[in-house]
């Protein structure tokens, strides 16, 4: 790619077509996509009902800006908040949603200090990059936005040491996806929430990767019955169309009046048409129950076939956000899997990250397990 900045280490594959879990490259080779576009295409590629909703909106109007009323924004916001005391700000991506959350927290509390966690990932714009607890993400960009403090994840004593009356907010992921697929301990998450309330700090949960059914509930924080002051969405909210959302408790709106924040494209009708259909699908009776059944089936097979392998250190995650920690580099495994027709990701040097569409079939799960088995067992033999 001669005319594009080299900001990505791209795989040598050009995906040109997709349907459900299956994608096809420019040479005609097909793959099982167990990346979902990095947890984006939760309903698979080109789901018929979402495609129809987009096509219908395309024929009417795409963009009007936020100068005008938008019934579609209100409709999607209602589906997200589902009768709770929350309001929504629409934007175009996860990093923008997190920027909005950080701005709201500081403006509402009048405080600057924000606690985040080591190995976290919240985005690459300056505010969300500053919130990210990874030095490699910060390198080369000069002075970060001040006021951020990073503490070890799942470590309540370190957290207690940093939390004080000057803390505006605490920002966390219930599963650190980019940081190695590290689930937050349920008791730790609950205690963090309790301590935030006691200190008067807002709790912000970054649901960009864990939201929209990925962990088996509509939002990942519902796994542990948390009640965040603010949470953020993107990725699966548009199933490939650019949309993000910052969701906050209604009383916070006193700090976010006209002129306090904005977005030219945020909440555009085309992305919202997709989001509405996606949310309606996920809220259908039995949808998430089926996701959980398939995820349990997949997890059982992973543990049955791979836990005993010498090179497999751990299998962890929730729902269809799964990490396999290896005793060696993950990159060669990902390459060989791709050659055999299975696309997965890494989450660090030795972590395989597996993110199939929520609509994956049992037969596709079986096929993926077969490919994984052939490659991981071969890697084990090769290391002996």
Curated annotation (Swiss-Prot):
Name under which the protein is recorded: Acetylornithine aminotransferase
Cystine connections: none
Organism taxonomic ancestry: Bacteria, Bacillati, Bacillota, Bacilli, Bacillales
Misc. comment: May also have succinyldiaminopimelate aminotransferase activity, thus carrying out the corresponding step in lysine biosynthesis.
Enzyme's top EC category: transferase
Entry keywords, A to Z: Amino-acid biosynthesis, Aminotransferase, Arginine biosynthesis, Cytoplasm, Pyridoxal phosphate, Transferase
Any one Gene Ontology cellular component term annotated for this protein: cytoplasm
CDD domains given in the database record: OAT_like (cd00610)
Name of the gene: argD
Residue sites binding N(2)-acetyl-L-ornithine per the record: 124, 263
UniProt source species: Listeria innocua serovar 6a (strain ATCC BAA-680 / CLIP 11262)
